[in-house]
């Protein structure tokens, strides 16, 4: 009788430790979090990935740029006050002189080959990072409407 109870207890413990339920629980939590996040926050999160891969080498992970070469995005009046020009620069590149935070920059930023969604996402990320605060989401439709 003792061996039967011990065997039954062992089976219950093994079945109770099944990892599938835990994995499903984590998956459900991730799904819930994604549903709770606003479209802007989802875009910002995707934009962070694009920024890290495409933009951070010149504008730095801190968004502070490189003095006299690449303008800062952190606290940038050009970025936050010139929405159309900023979208155009990310989408098509930028050549020529600009003034950022009262300092001139005269370099070349090549087009990075991003699609409209990636441009919108990286714009939302940069416009809401490092102290920048923009509540109006940049959409892929808005980016598509920006012509060279």
Regions picked out by a protein language model, each given a short descriptive name:
Residues 2-9:
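Sec-dependent signal peptide recognition
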Residues 13-16:
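C-terminal motif of bacterial Sec signal peptides marking the signal peptidase cleavage site
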Residues 19:
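Short, conserved catalytic or interaction motifs in soluble domains
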Residues 23-50, 145-146:
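Electrostatic cytochrome c docking/interface patches
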Residues 40-66, 78-92:
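Sequence/structural segment immediately N-terminal to covalent heme-attachment motifs in c-type
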Residues 68-74, 95-147:
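Axial heme c-ligation environment in periplasmic c-type cytochrome domains
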């Amino acid at each position: 009788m003792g061996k039967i109870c011990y065997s039954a207890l062992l089976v219950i413990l093994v079945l109770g430790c099944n990892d599938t339920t835990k994995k499903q629980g984590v998956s459900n939590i991730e799904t819930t979090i994604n549903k709770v996040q606003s479209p802007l926050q989802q875009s910002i999160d995707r934009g962070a990935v694009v920024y890290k891969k495409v933009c951070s080498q010149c504008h730095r992970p801190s968004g502070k740029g490189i003095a006299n070469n690449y303008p800062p995005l952190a606290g940038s009046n050009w970025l936050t006050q010139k929405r159309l020009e900023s979208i155009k620069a990310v989408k098509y590149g930028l050549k020529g002189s600009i003034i950022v935070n009262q300092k001139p920059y005269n370099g070349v930023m090549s087009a990075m080959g991003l699609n409209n969604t990636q441009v919108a996402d990286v714009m939302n990320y940069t416009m809401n990072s490092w102290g920048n605060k923009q509540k109006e989401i940049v959409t892929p439709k808005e980016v598509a409407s920006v012509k060279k």
